[in-house]
Amino acid sequence: MQEKAVVLDDQMIRRALTRISHEIVERNKGVDNCVLVGIKTRGIFIAQRLAERIGQIEGKEMEVGELDITLYRDDLTLQSKHKEPLVKGSDIPVDITKKKVILVDDVLYTGRTVRAAMDALMDLGRPSQIQLAVLVDRGHRELPIRADYVGKNIPTSSEERIEVDLQETDQQDRVSIYDK
């Protein structure tokens, strides 16, 4: 893969997450009855960062959960090729029934990951509302899904790939576009 450009650096990511945090607080009139749920793997770290910023804004801690969607993916057979899927499990510290759940992921592309995440959430409870926060929306939707909170819209071609690097997993914060 050939890197074409860095489209978000660490400062731009920090600003985008701060803006999303303010938007979440404003839209929900605070964060009472809200839970952030990160989709494994990078969505978890983004959710934790959002919770930290929201805590600074609101002066209260926000619950953060982890969602493993491995068994809910519709491309599982395409990925596994006769191997058993590696399931890490979900960890959501509160009952999500009647709560506003804000799903968090790094990149929104076809919408299939979000659909799988909603299926997984419904098996864990019945939230009053599901909202979606993403760092990057790259377009190319295959399902009627849109994000409520977007760090940056980055239009891409289907021949390009978006890579999100986060300090927690990649020792740096940046978003890059690559040729496939």
Swiss-Prot record:
<dbReference type="InterPro" id="IPR000836">
    <property type="entry name" value="PRibTrfase_dom"/>
</dbReference>
<protein>
    <recommendedName>
        <fullName>Bifunctional protein PyrR</fullName>
        <ecNumber>2.4.2.9</ecNumber>
    </recommendedName>
</protein>
<dbReference type="InterPro" id="IPR023050">
    <property type="entry name" value="PyrR"/>
</dbReference>
<comment type="function">
    <text>Regulates transcriptional attenuation of the pyrimidine nucleotide (pyr) operon by binding in a uridine-dependent manner to specific sites on pyr mRNA. This disrupts an antiterminator hairpin in the RNA and favors formation of a downstream transcription terminator, leading to a reduced expression of downstream genes.</text>
</comment>
<keyword id="KW-0808">Transferase</keyword>
<comment type="similarity">
    <text>Belongs to the purine/pyrimidine phosphoribosyltransferase family. PyrR subfamily.</text>
</comment>
<comment type="function">
    <text>Also displays a weak uracil phosphoribosyltransferase activity which is not physiologically significant.</text>
</comment>
<keyword id="KW-0328">Glycosyltransferase</keyword>
<dbReference type="GO" id="GO:0003723">
    <property type="term" value="F:RNA binding"/>
</dbReference>
<dbReference type="InterPro" id="IPR050137">
    <property type="entry name" value="PyrR_bifunctional"/>
</dbReference>
<dbReference type="GO" id="GO:0004845">
    <property type="term" value="F:uracil phosphoribosyltransferase activity"/>
</dbReference>
<keyword id="KW-0806">Transcription termination</keyword>
<dbReference type="GO" id="GO:0006353">
    <property type="term" value="P:DNA-templated transcription termination"/>
</dbReference>
<feature type="short sequence motif" description="PRPP-binding">
    <location>
        <begin position="101"/>
        <end position="113"/>
    </location>
</feature>
<dbReference type="Pfam" id="PF00156">
    <property type="entry name" value="Pribosyltran"/>
</dbReference>
<keyword id="KW-0805">Transcription regulation</keyword>
<dbReference type="InterPro" id="IPR029057">
    <property type="entry name" value="PRTase-like"/>
</dbReference>
<keyword id="KW-0804">Transcription</keyword>
<comment type="subunit">
    <text>Homodimer and homohexamer; in equilibrium.</text>
</comment>
<keyword id="KW-0694">RNA-binding</keyword>
